[in-house]
């Protein structure tokens, strides 16, 4: 499941945690939250419709070849389309959408040679540019993981960089597992799928 509900004691309100590979759309007084390392999260909103959403994703693969880069970008396209289409179904208009971008850090040693955080950040910026959706803020790249709290009805986002060693280790473990799962789903060059 891409998200789960909980009560956030720090903010004293209902919240939705968006997990890696997930997204959530909300218009009520609910907070969307996630924790990011190399993954990216796009917080998108339409202020007139008072609806917003958040996704959390990573491009799979090592970035070692045009074919694999092309295949892995399909995961990013899917994550972005799910978010945008979910907002449109809730009354948003594409020309009014604004985005805040987070994540894309270099926090996992085993993935640092692939520059996965940089690839994720570059992908999301290029995608939004191609779709004509303006980025109005965020916090990307660097070496620290982040906790992002997003209030979709207003478009307000808070970002806290995490420094505790245990937080970094937990995020790195979670993202390694997510990357491994995505890599297993990425088709192998020359493979044939029978249907």
Swiss-Prot record:
It is an enzyme of class 3 (hydrolase). GO terms for molecular function: protein-glutamine glutaminase activity. It holds the Pfam family CheD. One of its GO terms (biological process) is chemotaxis. Its EC number is 3.5.1.44. It catalyses: L-glutaminyl-[protein] + H2O = L-glutamyl-[protein] + NH4(+). Keywords: Chemotaxis, Hydrolase. Signal peptide: none annotated. InterPro entries: CheD-like_sf, Chemorcpt_Glu_NH3ase_CheD, Cytotoxic_necrot_fac-like_cat. It comes from the Bacteria. The keyword Hydrolase applies. PANTHER family: CHEMORECEPTOR GLUTAMINE DEAMIDASE CHED-RELATED. Probably deamidates glutamine residues to glutamate on methyl-accepting chemotaxis receptors (MCPs), playing an important role in chemotaxis. Belongs to the CheD family. This is Probable chemoreceptor glutamine deamidase CheD 2. It comes from Burkholderia thailandensis (strain ATCC 700388 / DSM 13276 / CCUG 48851 / CIP 106301 / E264). The gene is cheD2.
């Amino acid at each position: 499941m891409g998200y789960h509900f909980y009560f956030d004691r720090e903010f004293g309100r209902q919240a939705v945690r968006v997990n890696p590979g997930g997204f959530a759309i909300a218009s009520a007084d609910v907070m969307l939250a996630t924790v990011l390392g190399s993954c990216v999260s796009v917080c998108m909103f339409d202020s007139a419709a008072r609806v917003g959403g958040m996704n959390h994703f990573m491009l799979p693969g090592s970035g070692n070849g045009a074919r694999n880069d092309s295949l892995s970008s399909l995961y990013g396209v899917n994550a972005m389309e799910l978010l945008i289409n979910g907002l449109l179904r809730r009354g948003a208009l594409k020309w009014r959408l604004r985005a805040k971008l987070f994540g894309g850090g270099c926090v996992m040693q085993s993935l640092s040679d692939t520059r996965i955080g940089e690839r994720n950040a570059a992908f999301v910026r290029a995608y939004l540019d191609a779709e004509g959706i303006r980025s109005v803020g965020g916090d990307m790249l660097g070496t620290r993981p982040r906790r992002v709290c997003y209030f979709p009805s207003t478009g307000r986002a808070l970002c806290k960089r995490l420094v505790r060693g245990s937080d970094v280790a937990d995020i790195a473990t979670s993202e390694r597992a997510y990357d491994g799962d995505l890599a297993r789903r990425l088709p192998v060059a020359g493979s044939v799928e029978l249907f």
